[in-house]
């Protein structure tokens, strides 16, 4: 049995899944648009 695979790191989390990261690419903006359309309270990490 190995180590737990989830190693929390807020900096990495924001850098990869944060709002600014989403806005930086065309597909990321599509993600936000879908989540807005769905009515998600939280759009990104």
UniProtKB/Swiss-Prot annotation:
Keywords: Ribonucleoprotein, Ribosomal protein. The keyword Nucleotide-binding does not apply. GO terms for cellular component: ribonucleoprotein complex; ribosome. One of its GO terms (molecular function) is structural constituent of ribosome. It holds the Pfam family Ribosomal_L34. The keyword DNA damage does not apply. Gene3D superfamilies: 1.10.287.3980. Residues 1-45 are annotated as: Disordered. InterPro entries: Ribosomal_bL34, Ribosomal_bL34_CS. Residues 10-20, 27-45 have a biased composition (Basic residues). GO terms for biological process: translation. Belongs to the bacterial ribosomal protein bL34 family. PANTHER family: LARGE RIBOSOMAL SUBUNIT PROTEIN BL34M, MITOCHONDRIAL RIBOSOMAL PROTEIN 34 FAMILY MEMBER. This is Large ribosomal subunit protein bL34. The gene is rpmH.
């Amino acid at each position: 049995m190995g180590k737990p695979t989830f190693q929390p790191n807020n900096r990495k989390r924001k850098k990869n899944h944060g709002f600014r990261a989403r806005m930086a690419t065309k597909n990321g903006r599509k993600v936000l648009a879908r989540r807005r359309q769905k009515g998600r309270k939280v759009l990104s990490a």
